[in-house]
């Protein structure tokens, strides 16, 4: 069991230990056999705190015992000795601010013309926090007679488990065998934790010579992100200039900090014409648990800021958000370093259809009858609309820096073996089998496709985050499968044939590529008694590119419900959700990330609905609750 800190930014002076017999094993930073660190794409963090405590909840000590009950009782008797720390903040390992702009050279930033325009401001904040899985999962390590260390655990990043265990034991990765368990995760709770826990059990196994197990909850840490956007509108009601400032709080260590900045940048780009645009994204350090993407919440936060700002602009111009989108959006997005030009015609058509289906314009215009001094009902009312494009996977820069690979082989038995580290989800291999079966014209995909996972020589196919395996990975797999099929059909082909391929797309012209799009409308009521938002109706309409769409409507509903749960809102007793989807196959470069798209759409629409219901001057904070609404209704922003 792990003893975690209850303080932050303190000097760690040691521990007051109870008397423990030979049945117990204590692991601290001082007796870790190898390296006391975990390396996540260049960001190094200690497995256990050694001389100082960086954040509340940081692992300090691990205790193994004969059973869980006695171990827990013994752990409660261990006291942590700390003292004040002369702390000087060091941000040398944090990324520099990310800037992007156009039109500033021609238009300036504070010219006289801008001073005469109307100014519209909005803000949105996704507060940092932890999402902990309800059930504890087991992590088991044992060593065989040949000295091979075996690890059994669920993981969204299997190769990192092996790398971390090898580092902690001061061994090569060839001496570590991973046995991945299947998992079902809502967020990224199996991304980093299993690598740390597997290191602890492996150290204990090496010291005791016995199999060692621990059970821990998966924890996904959500980054805190705040947005502030200002748009200047001319006398004709046209947006002319815009500035956006984003501040990210990833905790004490900024895991993949540059990539998080890039993921946000591509999602805050406006779709309407502007003479000038300026964005600045900076990452600040704090004494909080380090965070990463947390189930696409980075995407969702960026699109939410855009959705709230669209509502603010529409209100200023006496339009509904849907009318504003249809009146001001360009025919296509602007080509930038972040994403290519993308036609918006189909997206605007979905905005038009979902507005009609949900009766959005009428409900938006009449919402004041339920709020403020005109509110005669026992609740506040709001309705929000969002529209957006889907991006998935890592940026081109990150893909080039890491070169994640996978391997296909066509064997002498006419089987196709797939080698790499693949997500052990309950349906993780379904799409892979379908692609291979279709290409090799096999009706029995069970006989055709064999998975070889976690072996000593398996290539590192990267982490299962940002829906990589349902987006870029499948596109790369299709290309490799076609090439392997052509090689296998040659008359002089010598079997087996082995082919390695990138699991990320390194050839994109921009950092990201759009794939799939959608719209959502969320209708909320805020009872004046509880002040906790209740989602009443949801409409979702998406166009997605997937190898197979069986059961996709159920998946979309599930993603939406998980998003609402994580944002601190309830479902009304008469809750209803309507889902529509169509297949988009217009020469897309990647498959769609359904998770990114749906979570972002419903989060954005929900934030806009709550903003309207509570009558905010600028924006909202999420996750939401009664205290936040009371603060806003009281005028304290």
Say what each PLM segment does.
Residues 1-349, 353-358, 362-637:
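Cofactor-binding beta-sheet edge motifs in enzyme active sites
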